[in-house]
Amino acid sequence: MGPVMLDVVGYELDNEEKEILQHPLVGGLILFTRNFYDVEQLRELVRQIRKASRHRLVIAVDQEGGRVQRFREGFTCLPAAQSFAGLSDNLNGTQLAEEAGWLMASEMIAMDIDISFAPVLDLGHQCAAIGERSFHEDPEQAKMMAEHFIKGMHSAGMKSTGKHFPGHGAVNADSHKETPCDDRPLEVICHHDMSIFRDFIQRNLLDAIMPAHVIYPQVDKHPASGSSYWLKSVLRQQLGFNGVIFSDDLSMEGAAMMGSYVERGQTALNAGCDMILICNNRDGAVSALDNLPLTKVEKLSELYHRGGQYSLNELKNSERWQQANKALTALYEQWQDCAR
């Protein structure tokens, strides 16, 4: 399949989108809140996508929990990653983190969605783009919670995506709006932020990784998402990562310094990304499809969900879902009360 992941505009496919999904460069599609009205509509949209595409696409969503959860009505409202470490004991926190990973993945698989881009492995809560999406500022605490979240995802049949390599948590700027710079030296980044990625790669916990649209000027002049140093020299060679590398959305301002959409896509692919995301700009996406060279990335098929076939109603009738839903809803409400 091709190396480009796109989006669609609304609740159902239009004729142009059906044509675009036939393009040999298209290998994936990401869904947003604007694509969701209710469970039945979402199920029909996914069915349309499967029918319209040339081959099976990787269908993705950001269903992390907390403020980043694209589908809410009819699904469990998932607590933010930060909330798990705030519980009175680590055992309860890790158990709930695992159930959150399992429940999130199970609900998405019930809709025939392959992956949620999760978990966030960035450290700390100061960054505007990260905040409560981070499990903890301490690497060991973050590892403990994230490991159990991934364990839950895997048990449901969903692959994990760690983001945002080598770490987005130490900058205040939001890469959706500008290109952040992290001025720390390489040894600090490697020892602190990157330690969770290194550990999880060694233990085969990460199936995919998404690099940050962040520049680390003491290391390389390019954002990590377009840096062959970070993706090839560090991630592939030094850390030995063999999974899928996704770019973050190339329409974000953090990627704008890489040039036009074609230039952004080519830069990210040349740097080592296996699949590039081009969202929220149809003209940019079409330009990339028209001008990028035809390539195939066979390893993307490894990201298809392995959860079997069941409906959302069948899932909700299971005892595990009911218990997990009750506990996670209570934590979600508790966290919302604390945030007010």
Curated annotation (Swiss-Prot):
One of its GO terms (biological process) is carbohydrate metabolic process. Its EC number is 3.2.1.52. Gene3D superfamilies: Glycoside hydrolase, family 3, N-terminal domain. Keywords: Cell cycle, Cell division, Cell shape, Cell wall biogenesis/degradation, Cytoplasm, Glycosidase, Hydrolase, Peptidoglycan synthesis. Substrate binds at residues 62, 70, 133, 163-164. It catalyses: Hydrolysis of terminal non-reducing N-acetyl-D-hexosamine residues in N-acetyl-beta-D-hexosaminides. This is Beta-hexosaminidase. It comes from Photorhabdus laumondii subsp. laumondii (strain DSM 15139 / CIP 105565 / TT01). The gene is nagZ.
